[in-house]
């Protein structure tokens, strides 16, 4: 069992770690007054309700209630243990961390196996790269890359490598270094023979592209065949390390550029990303052989608002663009589309016309989703033909009718009227027909029920019982004034009605008894339970008077203690009813007297 992290190390790490900087690696934050706000990473939202306080060094979401300090943020975001979060930040801020502390959480028994998988991937990334750059076996692969426009600088930047044309070289290479074959199969690096006689290498005679997770660790590979081998591209399978529906290629490198440019450029494949980065579009990322998912969108939305889609110009690429734009817009993203000329993908375009033209004429000249759709609707239609022209105009009007802004609708109606020499009035009239068709039937009863439900839900969230509010206010004053802690110890002790309140009070009592300095930062560092940490951030956000008057204190204490008596009265009344049912009138009379006594204590 590892030793406990010394308090002075925890304090040093917390003082050095800037919570705005740490959370800013995950969430796009904007300063509003003294605090910073962004979209909560713990629940879906389109309006920022996630607050970070640099003064108090805490975060709090007014939407879902998540909250805590820099350590609890990493615990909730990454699944770290407390020790892991302290160790991670100590490393980030170059603070010496004791060697005798066990960092990995016992709650993750698979972590040692995953660690071996990660080590194998990192080792192979370096080995594959060495084979490509420094050996005669890798010369053909290197020549291929150079002929395709890859520079040696780009090859080094993305650590591109080469897998030998061998069935068992990597198998022997890994076994010799102490890796289990079964574990490496689970990591996606080896394949078990059908007859069960052993294992063979998954990647053979391929140019190897390492795939990193969002923190920069290698978790998978994609191999491009050099000869006639099929498939042309082979990706690692899903593994405990690699989940393609949750990973965006190059995101760990692109994140800072995305923040700086305030946009992300999304491609369909990693080859497009590498070419785009060489063209100085460094905010480039890609999905890994899968359609855009909700998880991808959540990652993007936490970091940026504007997404430029740059997919292939074939039919499949157009349809993927439509699907991705719809998903992104539903989550509150501003979407634009980079239009590639027909028959080309982004990589082809860059090789044909150059990186500067790609950046200026394609990426920086991206269009709105509506403009892209208007171009898409033209495909396969002869606009000189009246039938095709009418079909096109109807398609465009239907799409315009789905736009939420009347100003935006007017812009495209004017554009349509000008292009086809039609009156704007007739188009607007037809537009109103489509707009009415878009509106769902209003079931007033159902609507009222839904509104009532939402109102009730909001009221439940906003209104708390009097005793609960009293406990929260007592805790808030205790956090601001040491003298209040002593008064609450004497009058309430541990008689808080809510378990989390009782636990937080225990922390405050301990600080008081130790004579320790009581600050939000010190208390947050001591609290390792996420529920208590969340409660603490919530309480710290409460607005209370600078001083607690004796009348207010007495009122809060009375509400807290009376609640326990109310609970006891209910229990006694239930016992009395049962005694009367059993015809035990002597016990019923005794219980009635106890109830009278309890009722008197409420006054």
Swiss-Prot record:
A GO cellular-component term linked to this record: DNA-directed RNA polymerase complex
Binding residue positions for Mg(2+) 1: 268, 312
Matching SUPFAM superfamilies: DNA primase core (SSF56731), N-terminal domain of DnaB helicase (SSF48024), Zinc beta-ribbon (SSF57783)
EC number: 2.7.7.101
Reactions performed catalytically: ssDNA + n NTP = ssDNA/pppN(pN)n-1 hybrid + (n-1) diphosphate
Binding site for Mg(2+) 2: 312, 314
Zinc finger (CHC2-type): 40-64
GO BP annotation list: DNA replication, synthesis of primer
InterPro entries: DNA_heli_DnaB-like_N_sf, DNA_helicase_N/primase_C, DNA_primase_core_N_sf, DNA_primase_DnaB-bd, DNA_primase_DnaG, DNA_primase_Znf_CHC2, DnaG_bac, DNAG_N
NCBIfam families per the UniProt record, alphabetical: dnaG (TIGR01391)
Known function: RNA polymerase that catalyzes the synthesis of short RNA molecules used as primers for DNA polymerase during DNA replication.
Oligomer and partners: Monomer. Interacts with DnaB.
Protein name: DNA primase
Species, as recorded: Bacillus subtilis (strain 168)
